[in-house]
Every structure is written in structure tokens, then in C-alpha cells.
């Protein structure tokens, strides 16, 4: 599933092609995604795209009358292609642009979404999200206040979008390993010093993943159709039973909140 770095890489890739371009048409071949594509999204026709934003794992294409909200789901991708490029299987949505290019959405599993947010409103999917991890709002003090008294495992805690957005399973595993924190430790029992390190590591891991073009394990490709290379940098995710890269201890694998969790029993306390 594309996580924050993959969505940010997509945003960076499409922005030079779509920013300040007018949407001349929208072609919906299959509107049955995670939620049905609303008819209101046709309001984007003949509107200029004034900004391309990311909020959590949602991309927003802003226009003067509203924003198209795009979620890549489990297997979605956006690519910029020349006009007239024949659609392939699972190419569900095209935005035709005044430049002569098209922004094409492909989603084999159809767990993604295209939604519409009228101007000066906030769609319910965005209403209760926590802060962005790569901003100054996400600090150790903030995380400490939220964690106070919480018995939830720290891994589940940092994956909660109401606490902080965009720390998906891959990056939660990697950040906790880098910070030396056991993923099953209660969030309220993590010391302020350890939370400071964790915040720094979350920021560092996400920033490096973006720099590497995201993580391609199966489906993800960027706007140029290329995979991300952060998978080559993974230290623990997907490596249960292998030696810890720091101490050589066999990495343990458990389920936390039904998600695969890999950690080192020696390095993470």
C-alpha cells in the first residue's frame, strides 16, 4: 500500500505537469472504487489546477471551485502520459490537461478513491487527521502529551492517523528500530527522552524514503512509472528471522494490531 513517502513522491512527480494547467475533460471508465466517484467531480472541467497538495495519504488537486481528492488505496498510481495514449486494463480515470497531456489513474484492486471537496469546505475524510510528521507541529512535546497514560502499544499509537498521519506499517517498523524502542511497549511508558529520539527518527526515515523515491514492494510506481528504491534500505521490515543489522540477534516477528511487526529483542527495549 502506498504510504506517505510514496504519495509525496507522486505529488512531486505530477506537480510540474499539472500545476496551472486547465482540466479540459475528465474521463471515468470505472467509478466503482472504494467509494463511488461522485458526479460533483465533473465540476473540475474547465478549471485550472492552482495547487497540488498532500494531506496524510490523500492528494488534493485544488481549483477555484473545489478540490479533487485522490487516494491511491492498495495499488493505485498516477502517471502523466501524452494525450491519445490508449488506456490499459485498470486505467479507471483520466484528467485531460490543456498542455496536451493526461493524468491517468490506474488501480487494479480498486481500493483507492476520487472524491470532491467544494471550495471553503473540508471533506469528512480529512476532518479529524493529526499533524503532518514532517512539520514543526509534530514534536516530542506534542507526542508526550498525546501518549500520557496510554496503554496502547507504541507502534499502534504512532500509526493512529488521529495522533500523527502517514506513519504506515513499513515506516513504523523502521522508525522504532532506529529509535531503539520495543514496538509492544505501552505508549505512556516510553520516556520523554525516547520520544524525542522517536520523533527525530520518524522524520528522518520518512524524509529519506521520499529522497529514495518511496518503497516498492509490489505495486507502487511513481508518476514516471518507475519503482521506489527505499526497499533496498529497509533494516527490519519484512526481515523476521534474519540477523539484526546492528547486533546480529535474530529478528523477531509478531502481529501488533493485525500488522506484521519485526524488531530486535536486544536493540529495542
From Swiss-Prot:
Enzyme nomenclature, EC number: 3.2.2.23, 4.2.99.18
Zinc finger (FPG-type): 235-269
CDD domains from the UniProt entry: EcFpg-like_N
Highest taxon of the lineage: Bacteria
SMART domains: Fapy_DNA_glyco (SM00898), H2TH (SM01232)
Keyword Hydrolase listed: yes
Cofactor note: Binds 1 zinc ion per subunit.
Cofactor(s) required, per the database record: Zn(2+)
UniProt cross-references to InterPro entries, sorted A to Z: DNA_glyclase/AP_lyase_DNA-bd (IPR015886), DNA_glyclase_Znf_dom_DNA_BS (IPR015887), Formamido-pyr_DNA_Glyclase (IPR020629), FPG_cat (IPR012319), MutM-like_N-ter (IPR035937), Ribosomal_uS13-like_H2TH (IPR010979), Znf_DNA_glyclase/AP_lyase (IPR000214), Znf_FPG/IleRS (IPR010663)
Active site positions, chain numbering: 2 (schiff-base intermediate with dna), 3 (proton donor), 57 (proton donor), 259 (proton donor)
GO MF entries: 8-oxo-7,8-dihydroguanine DNA N-glycosylase activity; class I DNA-(apurinic or apyrimidinic site) endonuclease activity; damaged DNA binding; zinc ion binding
Binding site for DNA: 90, 109, 150
Pfam families, alphabetized: Fapy_DNA_glyco, H2TH, zf-FPG_IleRS
Function: Involved in base excision repair of DNA damaged by oxidation or by mutagenic agents. Acts as a DNA glycosylase that recognizes and removes damaged bases. Has a preference for oxidized purines, such as 7,8-dihydro-8-oxoguanine (8-oxoG). Has AP (apurinic/apyrimidinic) lyase activity and introduces nicks in the DNA strand. Cleaves the DNA backbone by beta-delta elimination to generate a single-strand break at the site of the removed base with both 3'- and 5'-phosphates.
Complexes and interactors: Monomer.
NCBIfam families the UniProt entry points to: fpg, PRK01103.1
Protein name stated in the entry: Formamidopyrimidine-DNA glycosylase
Lineage: Bacteria, Pseudomonadati, Pseudomonadota, Gammaproteobacteria, Vibrionales
